[in-house]
């Protein structure tokens, strides 16, 4: 069984709540176990929580769940680009998958509502990567 940690943004919580519930249902469907959930203020705040989870022996992968809606400035792009880069760096540093379930940037609220399945897709990616990395490690 694959053990997952979730890092969930509180910003736009009505949307991240729906994303979280779909992600949990999909984890259960795939036979994965969500062993820990950490709430953070926003997507930009995720890296430290991700790093803390990746240090835990009982976490095989981390799933991020966030929603960054376009505003009047380019703030949404800066948030998502920096979060995505750091998330990828942490995955490589700890040699564990960290799946990007953050919707945005450049989307309206209506588009965000249409993309609540990003959390589900992130769970799918995390579980697949854990299994595939384990296959590589166990092959001759």
From Swiss-Prot:
Binding site for (2S)-2-hydroxy-3-oxobutyl phosphate: 72-73, 115
Keyword entries, A-Z: Riboflavin biosynthesis, Transferase
A GO CC term assigned to this protein in UniProt: riboflavin synthase complex
Catalyses which reaction(s): (2S)-2-hydroxy-3-oxobutyl phosphate + 5-amino-6-(D-ribitylamino)uracil = 6,7-dimethyl-8-(1-D-ribityl)lumazine + phosphate + 2 H2O + H(+)
Broadest EC class assigned to this enzyme: transferase
Keyword Transferase: yes
The enzyme's E.C. designation: 2.5.1.78
Bilayer-crossing regions: none
GO molecular-function term, one example from the UniProt record: 6,7-dimethyl-8-ribityllumazine synthase activity
One record GO biological process: riboflavin biosynthetic process
Active-site residues from the entry: 75
Binding-site residues for 5-amino-6-(D-ribitylamino)uracil, renumbered to this chain: 11, 43-45, 67-69, 100
Family classification: Belongs to the DMRL synthase family.
Function: Catalyzes the formation of 6,7-dimethyl-8-ribityllumazine by condensation of 5-amino-6-(D-ribitylamino)uracil with 3,4-dihydroxy-2-butanone 4-phosphate. This is the penultimate step in the biosynthesis of riboflavin.
Protein name as annotated: 6,7-dimethyl-8-ribityllumazine synthase
Organism listed in the record: Methanococcus vannielii (strain ATCC 35089 / DSM 1224 / JCM 13029 / OCM 148 / SB)
